[in-house]
């Protein structure tokens, strides 16, 4: 096994896996396995109020039904709260983060860019969100599919939340710490997270953590213009359609499975995918229309 490549799939149990999830899982799986790399599974269960009972078990069953095999033990973010809290305490003590008591109503009209109301205040950090101070700098990276991506953190994002006011830890912090802890070298995920990457680069730099390579695959868009996702009640992956949907996902990723694989079992499709994977064939687009993939 090639330990120089470590990839991962990190679903959230706020719903079941859908076709968009399958495309992301397949891309990350094949990108790792094609070079003999490791593929890890992490459950991003940071938000218990949004978690659907039974979703974690359903996600695991679906991955197994579709032929995915992961390395090592399943990691749950809910088991790593102490690590997140320790880093936040460090950032606060260094003046790199601060407590914010702004309400959603106060922030209406700012287009999601924090205006800095609490930046120079001295609020206690209980009953407050914790925000990370961001520099007035332009961050950029080369995505393996999407190419160069740039974002000015100060103008386009503002100081961002790393712990919510209700005490729940934010995705941006947890994903950076977990990727580093697990030794992830390659992050392959949906293009909806492209905009988050500069924030993660900044956190990696601030904490002295290694920077993985990034590859963002196109999102699958429904006819109404919404992405396939849990928020829009996209249909879960059916157990009896694993072969046809894997074949469709391969094509969505620009791979060219031969016609004789029509009707093939998941194991055969994944074997072909490992042997023939070419990330350069992935469409250089942030979105793909679901209707075009049928």
Swiss-Prot record:
Intervals of motif 'KMSKS' region: 227-231
Binding site for ATP: 230
This protein's UniProt keywords: Aminoacyl-tRNA synthetase, ATP-binding, Ligase, Metal-binding, Nucleotide-binding, Zinc
Sequence motif 'HIGH' region, location on chain: 11-21
EC number annotated for this UniProt entry: 6.1.1.-
Protein name per Swiss-Prot or TrEMBL: Glutamyl-Q tRNA(Asp) synthetase
Single Gene Ontology MF annotation: ATP binding
Biological role stated in the UniProt entry: Catalyzes the tRNA-independent activation of glutamate in presence of ATP and the subsequent transfer of glutamate onto a tRNA(Asp). Glutamate is transferred on the 2-amino-5-(4,5-dihydroxy-2-cyclopenten-1-yl) moiety of the queuosine in the wobble position of the QUC anticodon.
Taxonomic lineage: Bacteria, Pseudomonadati, Pseudomonadota, Gammaproteobacteria, Pseudomonadales
Residues that bind L-glutamate: 8-12, 44, 171, 189
Family: Belongs to the class-I aminoacyl-tRNA synthetase family. GluQ subfamily.
Gene: gluQ
Pfam families: tRNA-synt_1c (PF00749)
